[in-house]
From Swiss-Prot:
Family per record: Belongs to the TRAFAC class YlqF/YawG GTPase family. GEP3 subfamily.
GO molecular function term, any single one: GTP binding
Domain of life of the native organism: Eukaryota
Gene Ontology CC annotations of this record: mitochondrion
Compartments it resides in: Mitochondrion
Protein's recorded name: Genetic interactor of prohibitins 3, mitochondrial
SUPFAM superfamilies the UniProt entry points to: P-loop containing nucleoside triphosphate hydrolases
Sorted UniProt keywords: Mitochondrion, Transit peptide
Domain CP-type G per the UniProt entry, residue ranges: 171-374
Record keyword Transit peptide present: yes
Stretch forming the transit peptide: 1-19
Function: May be involved in the mitochondrial lipid metabolism.
Gene: GEP3
Disulphide linkage map: none
Length: 629
């Protein structure tokens, strides 16, 4: 049975790649080059130049010990010489690797790639392929190994380490990514539930019609309880309607899954076309999703084998695994994940080139580097280590932190809410009160006003009791203080009536609910680090909870919330605001200054009835008039 299974998988794999090459010659070339690429990030491997991209070491090598390296190299040469003098059967017996794929020794011509950094010379790849054969599995470059194993508590961009500087984490633009993909290859656009709808780049429709793109929302475990089928179906219906009405994407081209929890993986396998290229924003969860598909296939195989190893028990479809089987399964998953599939990391720009992933010998996918429109995206990560990035980008669970029953804090009368020191939300200063639900991993802290923030940041050191409220370290606090009124971007929050979500890209959202009677039209202001982006949107919880229509006061059924998507904005961009040069004048500037900037941005005449000012009455009828998507 074992040999027959191996044979069938081999035949399926060969046929699959054959048909792939017939449809997309460029895809076939990516497959050929996969043998000499880093399995984690996709870059071309080389073992001659440690200071250049793609450098790797075989297990046991140590760069710091040149003598040992020389001896190892000499031993490898002798080992190679011995192997060459053996016939094939003796060679296989010596290396004890009968199932290792036989590699072709011919050189493969390079193809255009996303590697916009120092090119790797052709002769640096001479030994890569043979070494992979001897090692028995794919190799990872030194940069990827260092990120995964050696950068937990230090800044991820270390200028003193050649393989951990910004040039080793390139983040291309959308156009660059698409230039490496065959024009007729299927596209699967992945976006995160953590910051929906910020992960959807409208420019994609300039290159492909919406009917030819498949959209997958991942990280849905932070929005929808896994066991709540009603919530899943309700939100899926909303998402399909949203994508259809906003972008004309067919409803059947939209799917919801979770790579982290391997949720809906079997259905996703059938949803994604064969030989698809998986695209999306950097850090949206593409690689995790692809890896989960790969693991899901092998988990099925392992479960089947575990059940078959019980000859004394009656086999049936209802047979279940025992506790010891699950423990063994967990170990198999951990071991398999560390050696197979694309690498996953919270660091933007981790994937550097196309990574072919064979799921089961039939379906093959291509993990593609993430893109971005934010040129300052990497700036904030200069100040953070791997653990901090993992924490803040993990996302928080909506049902736990964002529901009506969740814990909330109260902000009132001009207080400033610090978002772990990388953002400051200034609330209206007159008779106002808001409930705040934090659906992020940011540590929030209330200050009396901006002057209080300045007084803290002016000190040589942040008080120890407050250090946890600032995500950057103490040595960078003075720089941050100087940036608050200059380097930090100032945004006006568009007027809103009722509850909203303030969404921060890659981070999550903060639910803001006004309480009491509205007594002021003063606008909220957000100071945000330029590496971050934000929008406001209608509360996402409205589209997850029960779809049962409510009764209006006259007894008639209200329209369902999904029916208004084409008529009202679901979200709004924030209004860029000019920052005055004098910090004190900024704090004391009258609300009318923000009113004027809002009207100018929306091209509203100051003398018109619709102009935003203290006299305007905001209510249900005009609450979206000042939103702009």
């Amino acid at each position: 049975m074992f040999s027959r299974s191996i044979l069938l998988r081999s035949v399926r794999k060969s046929l699959g790649r054959y048909y792939s090459s017939q449809a997309h010659p460029q895809t076939y070339i990516y497959n050929l080059l996969s043998d000499t690429k880093c399995r984690s990030c996709g870059i071309q491997l080389q073992d001659k130049f440690p200071d250049k991209p793609g450098y790797y070491r075989l297990p046991g090598q140590n760069d710091s010990n040149t003598d040992k390296k020389a001896k190892t190299s000499e031993l490898n040469k002798k080992y190679e010489k011995i192997l060459q003098n053996l016939d094939i059967s003796d060679r296989n017996l010596l290396i004890n690797n009968f199932s290792a794929p036989k590699q072709d020794d011919e050189k493969v011509a390079s193809v255009p790639s996303l590697q916009q950094i120092t090119p790797v010379e052709a002769d640096t790849r001479d030994t890569t392929k043979d070494q992979q054969t001897h090692s028995g599995h794919s190799l990872s470059c030194k940069r990827c190994n260092d990120v995964i194993y050696n950068s937990k508590t230090r800044s991820i961009y270390d200028p003193n380490r050649d393989n951990l500087n910004k040039s080793e984490f390139p983040i291309p633009k959308l156009q660059q990514v698409l230039s490496t993909i065959p024009v007729d290859a299927p596209l699967v656009y992945v976006f995160s539930a953590n910051d929906f709808p910020m992960g959807i780049n409208k420019d994609i429709f300039q290159y492909r019609p919406p009917q030819q793109i498949y959209f997958v929302m991942t990280k849905s475990d932070i929005l929808i309880p896994k066991t709540n089928v009603a919530f899943y179906n309700n939100f899926k219906k909303f998402l399909q309607n949203y994508m259809f009405k906003k972008f004309n994407v067919p409803r059947e081209n939209v799917f919801i899954a979770s790579g982290k929890d391997r949720w809906k993986m079997t259905d996703l396998y059938h949803f994604i076309p064969n030989y698809s290229y998986i695209i999306g924003d950097t850090n949206c969860g593409k690689s995790t999703l692809v890896k989960s598909l790969l693991i899901n296939h092998h988990v099925k195989h392992w479960k089947y084998e575990a059940l078959q190893q019980r000859p004394d028990e009656k086999q049936s479809s209802s047979a279940s695994l025992k506790n010891k089987d699950f423990k063994k399964l967990d170990r198999l998953i951990d071991s398999f994940s560390s050696k197979n599939g694309p690498g996953t990391s919270h660091i933007p720009g981790f994937t550097r080139d196309v990574v072919p992933v064979d799921i089961d010998g039939i379906k093959e996918l291509f993990d593609v580097p993430g893109f971005t429109t934010n040129e300052n995206l990497q700036d904030i990560f200069d100040k953070l280590n791997h653990k901090q990035i993992a924490r803040i980008t993990k996302g928080a669970n909506t049902s736990k932190y964002g529901s009506l029953k969740s814990k909330f804090d109260t902000v009132k009368n001009g207080q400033v809410l610090s978002l772990n020191g990388v953002g400051y939300l200034q609330f209206p200063g007159q008779d106002s009160m808001y409930q705040i639900r934090n659906v992020t991993k940011f540590a929030l802290h209330k200050f009396k006003n901006l002057e209080k923030v300045d007084s803290i940041l002016q000190r040589n050191e942040i008080p120890k009791s407050m250090s946890s409220h600032f995500i950057v370290n103490r040595q960078q606090q003075q720089q941050q203080r100087n940036e608050l009124r200059g380097y930090y971007k100032r945004y006006i929050i568009p007027p809103f009536y009722g509850t909203i979500d303030l969404v921060i890209k890659d981070i999550g959202y903060i639910n803001i609910k006004p309480t009491g009677k509205k007594l002021t039209n003063e606008l909220m202001v957000l100071y945000l680090h330029p590496s971050l982006e934000a929008i406001i949107r209608q509360p996402i919880l409205n589209y997850i909870d029960s779809p049962t229509p409510k009764k209006s006061p006259d007894g008639t059924n209200r329209k369902t919330i999904t029916s208004d998507i084409s008529k009202t904005p679901f979200y709004s961009r924030l209004i860029p605001s000019t920052v005055l040069s004098d910090p004190s004048s900024l704090v004391l500037s009258p609300p009318s200054s923000d009113y004027n900037q809002l009207n100018q941005y929306l091209q509203i005449d100051e003398s018109s009835e619709s102009a935003y000012n203290d006299l305007l009455e905001l209510d249900e009828t005009n609450k979206y008039d000042y939103w702009i998507e």
